[in-house]
């Protein structure tokens, strides 16, 4: 596959991943009746009532992370082609991206397992609570730290090697800082999804874990598609 196709496909996959995220996000908003992890019976009932919703989000996550792997591989290739001296940073970016994808898949598997347990009579609320609490940092502080590293490394590599415009690098740095601002939420009190800043708060879990990365991927995805067009129009590609 030539550079033209790699850049176009990778950029398109990045944009497609965000499109699926936009479809997925409302599913989280319509879940009802979460009484907290300290109410075992209520937690099991919540999981049963929202089981289809949860499984749908897990399935959509599978699509998103698959598209993200293609996007990350293409961006790594772009970094290497633009400046071979930045290849190491491109590899670091891709490696951190794979770790992020792995963490997401583990968290998704735990979330799906809560539904499986809740639908298996008699359900074990203790197991459901354990798996639910195990997901908080995977979706929150841990994921945010990895996303920040990904965007910071990629932004430096693409600007240093002039693979992408400088403004995209500054956007990546800003998004990385936004993610890092929510990493310390892991130290703030008990998990409470109804509050903004805590290990399970809607700040780190819903806002910071999705929108900064989405903004950066949209910008880079569009630039990669345009990069592919310039490659196609260059004399070397003719």
Where are the regions a protein language model picked out?
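Hydrophobic, aromatic-enriched alpha-helical segments typical of multi-pass transmembrane helices
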Residues: 1-238
């Amino acid at each position: 596959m030539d550079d033209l196709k790699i850049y176009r496909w990778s950029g398109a996959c990045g944009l497609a991943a965000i499109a699926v995220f936009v479809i997925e996000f409302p599913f989280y908003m319509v879940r009802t009746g979460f009484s907290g992890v300290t109410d075992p019976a209520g937690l099991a009932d919540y999981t049963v009532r929202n089981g289809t919703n949860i499984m749908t989000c897990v399935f959509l996550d599978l699509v998103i992370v698959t598209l993200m792997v293609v996007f990350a591989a293409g961006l790594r290739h772009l970094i290497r082609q633009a400046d071979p001296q930045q290849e190491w940073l491109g590899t670091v970016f891709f490696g951190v991206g794979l770790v992020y994808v792995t963490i997401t898949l583990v968290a998704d598997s735990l979330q799906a397992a809560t539904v499986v347990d809740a639908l298996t009579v008699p359900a074990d609320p203790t197991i459901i609570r354990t798996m639910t609490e195990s997901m908080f940092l995977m979706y929150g502080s841990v994921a945010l730290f990895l996303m920040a590293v990904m965007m910071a490394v990629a932004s430096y590599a693409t600007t240093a090697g002039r693979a992408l415009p400088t403004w995209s690098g500054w956007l990546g740095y800003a998004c990385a800082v936004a993610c890092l601002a929510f990493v310390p939420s892991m130290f703030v009190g008990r998990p409470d999804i109804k509050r903004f800043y805590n290990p399970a708060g809607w700040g780190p879990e819903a806002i910071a874990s999705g929108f900064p990365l989405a903004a950066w991927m949209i910008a880079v995805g569009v630039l990669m598609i345009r990069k592919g067009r310039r490659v196609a129009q260059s004399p070397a590609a003719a």
